[in-house]
From Swiss-Prot:
GO cellular component assignments: cytosol; nucleus; protein kinase CK2 complex
Chain coiled-coil ranges: none
Compartmental location: Cytoplasm
Protein name (record): Casein kinase II subunit alpha
SUPFAM superfamilies, sorted: Protein kinase-like (PK-like) (SSF56112)
């Protein structure tokens, strides 16, 4: 079944519905219009590539659709680094990632881009990043105390708020892209390859994010989304960690993903969401979806996770995991949530 089978794709029906305005984000809607094209027009930048002579590969540490990632060493300073060797992709995409990393440089908990290099023979481009002594999330998350969880989610929200305040959506928040050095209590948000500048009333690709962390807007082909997509992904992460159920919404494909969400959040609010934005259910959708009532978070509590669950965290999840993207809590609002009181009180 094609993604478009899930929504009415009648070409005569324009989204959004004629009687509905596109609802702009609560905050940071006009950041890029204020900063001007020299800030966001990545297509017209000229990059100055250095030669990779100062870097040596030590070992492979990961791979993605668009790159291979290695631990490396700067042979001059002897410092560890991370070398991201880019696979052949459109120059535009490479320019976008670099421009975004340059714009966010120095922001809280954002991975630092140290250098950009290109091999003179192969012309293969690589990005050089600071090294983080990361523990794999599958090993780390089950060991975290509630204090640890509060601390790291707060640090992630801090990175997210900064990113949004600079007019940028990450669009691929997931455990694999959150590096944690647990010994030093350092968190870094990585992989800005899908990140994009937010411009009001612009259509965006829904082929972003990773299935388990995709917001409902992506699953129903709602292209006028905004920063709030990222808060959904953080909500999925938080639910997964708290309830020890990672990933929390475990869909087998993009269609089943929405079914898994509906089985928790219910179908009533999903229908309201469709109605509000002038979307129509295609007949095939109802066959997959069925009708589900909203489940209380307490349904997911068991003896292995009950020490992590509190009324505060359940309230925060209620505010993050909302179908209607315009009604989700913002990162800044989330940082003020009572769930983080002890973090705020302990921070200088």
């Amino acid at each position: 079944m094609d993604q478009m089978d899930l929504v009415d794709t009648d070409k005569s029906r324009k989204y959004p519905a004629k009687d509905l305005k596109i609802i702009l984000p609560k905050t940071y809607a006009d950041v890029n219009s204020k900063k001007g094209p020299e800030y966001w027009d990545y297509e017209n930048i000229t990059l100055k590539w250095n030669v990779p002579d100062s870097y040596e590969i030590v070992r492979k540490i990961g791979r993605g659709k668009f790159s291979e990632v290695f631990e490396g060493i700067n042979t001059v300073t002897k410092d560890k680094c991370v070398i991201k060797i880019l696979k052949p992709v459109k120059k535009k995409k490479i320019k976008r990632e670099i421009k975004i990393l340059q714009n966010l440089r120095g922001g809280p908990n954002i991975i630092k881009l140290l250098d950009i290099v290109k091999d003179p023979q192969s012309r293969t481009p690589s990005l050089i990043f600071e090294h983080v002594n990361n523990t794999d999330f599958k090993t780390l998350y089950p060991t975290l105390s509630i204090q640890d969880i509060k601390y790291y989610i707060y640090q992630l929200l801090k990175a997210m708020n900064y990113c949004h305040s600079q007019g940028i959506m990450h669009r691929d928040i997931k455990p694999h892209n959150v590096m944690i050095d647990h010994e030093k209590k350092i968190l870094r948000l990585i992989d800005w390859g899908l990140a994009e500048f937010y411009h009001p009333e612009q259509e965006y690709s829904v082929r972003v994010a990773t299935r388990y962390y995709k917001g409902p807007e992506l699953l129903v082909d709602m292209r006028y989304y905004d920063y709030s997509l990222d808060i959904w992904s953080i909500g999925c992460m938080l639910a997964g960690i708290i309830f020890k159920k990672e990933p929390f919404f475990y869909g087998h494909d993009n269609y089943d993903q929405l079914v898994k969400i509906a089985k928790v959040l219910g179908t009533e609010d999903l229908h309201r969401y469709f109605e509000k934005y002038g979307l129509k259910f295609a007949p095939a959708y109802q066959e997959i979806l069925g009708n589900h009532s909203k489940k209380p978070w307490t349904k997911f509590v068991h003896h292995e996770n009950q020490h992590l669950v509190s009324p505060e965290v359940m309230d925060l999840l209620d505010r993050m995991l909302v179908y209607d993207h315009t009604k989700r809590i913002t990162p800044l609002e989330a940082m003020e949530h009572p769930f983080f009181n002890e973090i705020k009180n302990n921070s200088v």
